[in-house]
Amino acid sequence: MTAPGSAAPSPGAADPAPHPGAPLTIALGPPEHGVTRFAVDSARAAGTPVLEVREVAALPAALAGRGRGPVHLHITDPLFGRTPDEAAAAVEALAADRPVSVTLHDVPQLAEGAERCRRRTRAYQCIARAAGLVVVSSEHERRLCADAGIAVDAVIPLPVPALGPPADLSPDARSVGVFGFLHPGKAVDVVAEAVAALAAGGDADITLRLLGAPADGHDDYVDAALQTARAAGGRVEVTGRVDDEDLARVLGEVTVPVALFRNVSASGSLGTWAAAGRRPLVWDSDYIREMEHDRPGSLLITDGTDLAGDLRRLLGDPSPTRIPPPPPGIEELGRAYRAAWAQWPTGPGGLA
């Protein structure tokens, strides 16, 4: 086991042969974090060498002896510092020694709160100024960046992963499933309240299944949501992190998949639901409309005015929640990153 804060080779399959001129991708953070995992996956898809580092404090030592070649960072500010300003300073320090390109994740938006948005926007502006190339994962994120005065060089959508069909699938009788790290942005409390309303109305078999683990600092929030459903007579389950080999089965078992987002700029979990052949119930938003345009028929969009009623109808007939899985998009992801780096004037191809 690799000690926290140390660099380590990518787990699992070996990295592909490096693509000529590709920057070193730094996958910063715990391996189970979604952004860290995506950094590794996108690097492998693009044929980019990967350096995995658990903590930002370990970056200087991990890069020692590697020269001053270009690097690519996948950034969400909590991975790079205890505060947004600390995160920006860490990227600026790195960019002082070598060319840096970045993919900005979790782009700030007002829905997360005005003061938090202000602090994070200032940090993302500093990061973008330090970077020679800025990538985001949706047109919605591009618009958010434009509103903040951040120029985006490329939009590379999050791909549908390759899950494959489950070996054994036993669909639940009456369950509502929420997938991924559990926190207020996933509106777990709202889903729990809708499940509680159905249970209180006589649905004795309904189960709230939370297919993931609480995000750091949100155990009490998840516990409160579970208690809401349980107090009304509903059944509850928290699986903890779902192993990759079990994803297709676990996501395929739930009766009604739900992916409500209070504030989202791009979401990998929607692609994972699709890869499992599921069409989740989602709140309408700019990003959701963008995803429905890109993958027509992949989402069940609701205005949220009667979530309990939406769930009741789908529990009675869950067939609209099942779709043929779209083809995986990992190869296209790799091509898109290579194309973006090729246009980087101070990056690969432009370095002495």
What do the PLM-derived regions correspond to, one by one?
Residues 168-186, 192-195, 208-209:
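Conserved donor-binding/catalytic core segment of Leloir-type glycosyltransferases
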Residues 222-242, 248:
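Nucleotide-activated donor-binding/catalytic signature segment of Leloir-type glycosyltransferases, i.e.
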Residues 89-93, 98, 116-133:
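Membrane-proximal helix-turn-helix segments that form the acceptor-binding/catalytic region
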Residues 207-223:
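Glycosyltransferase donor-sugar binding loop
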Residues 37, 305, 309, 315-352:
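A charged, aromatic-enriched C-terminal amphipathic alpha-helix characteristic of glycosyltransferases
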Residues 129-165:
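Donor nucleotide-sugar binding/catalytic pocket of nucleotide-sugar-dependent glycosyltransferases
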Residues 279-284:
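Short hydrophobic beta-strand element within catalytic cores of glycosyltransferases
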Residues 249-265, 278:
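Acidic donor-binding loop of glycosyltransferase active sites
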